[in-house]
Curated annotation (Swiss-Prot):
Swiss-Prot/TrEMBL keywords: Ribonucleoprotein, Ribosomal protein, RNA-binding, rRNA-binding, tRNA-binding
Assembly and binders: Part of the 30S ribosomal subunit. Contacts proteins S9 and S11.
GO cellular component, one term: small ribosomal subunit
Summary of the function given for this chain in its UniProt record: One of the primary rRNA binding proteins, it binds directly to 16S rRNA where it nucleates assembly of the head domain of the 30S subunit. Is located at the subunit interface close to the decoding center, probably blocks exit of the E-site tRNA.
Provenance organism: Acinetobacter baumannii (strain AB0057)
Name used for this protein in its record: Small ribosomal subunit protein uS7
HAMAP family: Ribosomal_uS7_B
Family: Belongs to the universal ribosomal protein uS7 family.
Length: 156
């Protein structure tokens, strides 16, 4: 293991419109090739669309939707005596959020709406209702962990 000091996590600046760190972090997940202004317009467009449809505070809606997508457990591969076991592990809070955001963006990208903002809005609305590809991904991960519960004594 490295003997250097542990590097402190960088402070993420809140987004300009809602002054929310979570939305700023989500923008960074949506961003491709460093084009933050495009990612910003996509996320704000999606949140406006959600606000039009549901008549709710977009930040609050986003937070609750993200909470529904966050995984509690996941499986990690662990080699024991030549065999590889899928060992269920609890997910630490920062990784839960990162996975949920990644799954939302990936699920939105695979949708068929015309613009990414519409796809993202659709995926957020679906996730809030407990359906959609991001929720399915979470359930698949939980199912894998449940199926491999027998190997939980191999924890790291």
């Amino acid at each position: 293991m490295p003997r250097r000091r542990v590097v402190a996590a960088r402070e993420i600046l809140p987004d300009p419109k809602f002054s929310s760190q979570t939305i700023a972090k989500f923008m960074n997940h949506v961003m491709q090739d460093g084009k933050k202004s495009i990612a910003e317009s996509i996320v704000y467009g999606a949140l406006e669309r959600v606000q039009e449809k549901n008549k709710v505070d977009p930040v609050e809606f986003f937070e609750t939707t993200l909470e529904k997508v966050r995984p509690m457990v996941e499986v990690k591969a662990r080699r024991v005596g030549g065999a590889t076991y899928q060992v269920p592990m609890e997910v630490r809070p920062s990784r839960r959020t990162a996975l949920a955001m990644r799954w939302l963006v990936d699920a939105a990208a695979k949708r068929s709406e015309k613009t990414m903002a519409l796809r993202l809005a659709g995926e957020l609305l679906d996730a809030a209702e407990g359906k959609g590809a991001a929720i399915k991904k979470r359930e698949d991960v939980h199912r894998m962990a449940e199926a491999n519960k027998a190997f939980s004594h191999y924890r790291f």
